[in-house]
Amino acid sequence: MDIVIVVISILLALIVGIVVGYLVRRSIAEAKISSAERLAKQIVEEAHRNADAAKKEALLEAKDETHKFRQQAEDEIRERRMEAQKQENRLMQKEENLDRKSETLDKRESSLESKEQSLTEQQQQIEEMKSKVEAMKDEQQAELERISGYTSEQAKQIILERIEKEVQHESAVLIKESETRAKEEADKKAKNILSLALQRCAADHVAETTVSVVNLPNDEMKGRIIGREGRNIRTLETLTGIDLIIDDTPEAVILSGFDPIRREIARMALEKLVQDGRIHPARIEEMVEKSRREVDEYIREVGEETTFEVGVHGLHPDLVKILGRLKYRTSYGQNGLKHSAEVAYLSGLLAAELGEDVTLARRAGLLHDIGKAIDHEVEGSHVEIGKELAMKYKEHEVVINSIASHHGDEEATSIIAVLVAAADALSAARPGARSETLENYIKRLEKLEEISESFDGVEKSFAIQAGREIRIMVRPDEIDDIESISIARDIRKRIEGELDYPGHIKVTVIRETRAVEYAK
């Protein structure tokens, strides 16, 4: 029972608690709802107030924007009106200009109509005058035919023939003048090219002689060179082919010989013997053979050096060795190898001025006198020998022709061949390049004057410019101007046929006439 009561009490207490809790929560909820409603009402009221303010602000902004837009619209309308006014003014000006142009065109049209009418009248007058002129021309032509006895065709033919002759004469004169001008310009250009080439060419060699001198330490060495009964000197002369001249010249022996290579071998051998001190036939033979080998090697080296200096490459080794032998070959005292190198250099310069192959020109110039290296060993002129060597070693056909034509033996078939001949003449005629002995020089000058004075009408002659020019004075009462030209040509032919000389000789004939009167 007690437990039931307790349980019922607990249940009642629990129900009362629940009811009380519900009521309390309900009162709290109602209080919150009331508070929320008040807050909501405040928010609504605040929102209404804010909305009214925003509405007023928006209205103000809208009014402001409307005012600005209206102002811009008015400004734009005003600008458009002004632009329309300007366009209207321009159109009015154009209209006025068109009106003025229209008036001008009307005036021109009326003027042209009047001019056209005037031209029509003038044309009619011209036609009438043409008819009259034709009639007068026919009458005059008939009258001329009657008077001259020629028809118009015959007269026309005569006039044409006369005009043709005049034109032919004038053409011949013009052609001659053109040829003269062309020759003068060609000569001037050639002189300029030659002068440029000579200015750019600096030669460093001088004339050489046909003797060599070997210095001795003392005069006792002369006896040792001669040897017992002259056996040493005979052995040396026999092995080298060179004459040894032992005279009163102190401490010197002179070697004389035409072949420069043999002379050089003899000089080197003799210097070695003098330096060694042992001089007897066996030693002489040994030194001569050693010197010969050294000279051969030197010839090869100097040939290679020359080709390198000139800029010519690809020569056959045998041809290089033959070229080196020109080192010991002279012409009128001018060293053959130096002359060939100078001709090669000049040929290259001339070819460069004319736009030709410089390398080929130098090659042809270097080999132009190659035949002189062995012309004393092989039959024929140095030109023929050089041509055969070039063909043997398969040189370029331009090189072969340059060798064959540089002395006029064959016709030059290329510009380079002509340039090589010109360079050869320049090198030979250069002052100091070639020389003669004093005796031959004097004899040549005397022979020059003798040849010149052997002609009739020659009063006297003078060899000047070291024998490079001969001036002949003729008697004016016996020789006229035309005969002066003939005498100059005849003297030139005599000189070419009877004299040997380096370079060229200028022949000048002078004819002077003087008229003298005395006033009293």
Swiss-Prot record:
This is Ribonuclease Y. Disulfide bonds: none annotated. Keywords: Cell membrane, Endonuclease, Hydrolase, Membrane, Nuclease, RNA-binding, Transmembrane, Transmembrane helix. Residues 81-118 have a biased composition (Basic and acidic residues). It is found in: Cell membrane. One of its GO terms (cellular component) is plasma membrane. Residues 81-125 are annotated as: Disordered. Endoribonuclease that initiates mRNA decay. Its EC number is 3.1.-.-. SUPFAM superfamilies: Eukaryotic type KH-domain (KH-domain type I) (SSF54791), HD-domain/PDEase-like (SSF109604). Residues 210-273 form the KH domain. Its main location: membrane. It comes from Oceanobacillus iheyensis (strain DSM 14371 / CIP 107618 / JCM 11309 / KCTC 3954 / HTE831). One of its GO terms (molecular function) is RNA endonuclease activity. One of its GO terms (biological process) is mRNA catabolic process. InterPro entries: HD/PDEase_dom (IPR003607), HD_domain (IPR006674), HDIG_dom (IPR006675), KH_dom (IPR004087), KH_dom_type_1 (IPR004088), KH_dom_type_1_sf (IPR036612), Ribonuclease_Y (IPR017705), RNase_Y_N (IPR022711). It comes from the Bacteria. It is an enzyme of class 3 (hydrolase). Residues 336-429 form the HD domain. Belongs to the RNase Y family.
